[in-house]
A protein has these predicted regions:
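One-carbon transfer enzymes
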Residues: 1-168
């Protein structure tokens, strides 16, 4: 997304903050390189989940965020944030929802399940976030062919390159 804004592919858009729960994530370095604020905010840094939830909501409100884009964010978005930003939180999921989604279906697990099932087509889905896991209304999907001999890692890379990076 940062690259698309930088190249002019996406216009009239500003990324005000990149929020990450993983201190070593490349996203924070990329944000810094683009002159965008990077904010490390992990549930592990708070005594209770409620404290984290409120801090996350405050961080978004303080920066007057219009749209929340989840890209590799593996923390469950708290209900207080979903309610405050109803129909303004979008996520990318590395499968064609409703296949291979929901609790436990993230990262390589998605592609392992797809290959175990023997699907011929997988892909990516952009959807609104609601209080379920990968259950919000679908905005867009892009299919990607599964090839003979694919490993989860190879399929993951192909889906990122041919679908996720194109539609998100």
């Amino acid at each position: 997304i940062l690259d698309a804004i930088d190249s002019g592919k996406i216009t009239n858009t500003e990324i005000r903050v990149v929020i990450c729960n993983n201190e070593g994530a490349y996203a924070l370095e990329r944000a810094k390189n683009y002159g965008t604020e990077g904010l490390l905010l992990s549930p592990k840094s708070f005594e209770t989940r409620e404290e984290f939830n409120q801090k996350l909501l405050e961080a978004l409100k303080e920066r007057e965020i219009d749209l929340v884009v989840l890209a590799g964010y593996l923390v469950v978005v708290p209900p207080c944030v979903i309610q405050e930003y109803e129909n303004r939180i979008i996520n990318i999921h590395p499968s064609l929802i409703p296949s291979f989604c929901g609790k436990g279906c993230y990262g390589l697990h998605v592609h392992e399940k797809a290959l175990e099932r023997g699907v011929k087509v997988s892909g990516a889905t952009v959807h609104f976030v609601d209080e379920g896991t990968d259950t919000g209304p679908i905005i867009m999907q892009k299919p990607v062919m599964v090839e003979q001999g694919d490993t989860p890692e190879v399929l993951q890379r192909r889906i990122m390159e041919q679908a996720e990076w194109k539609i998100f």
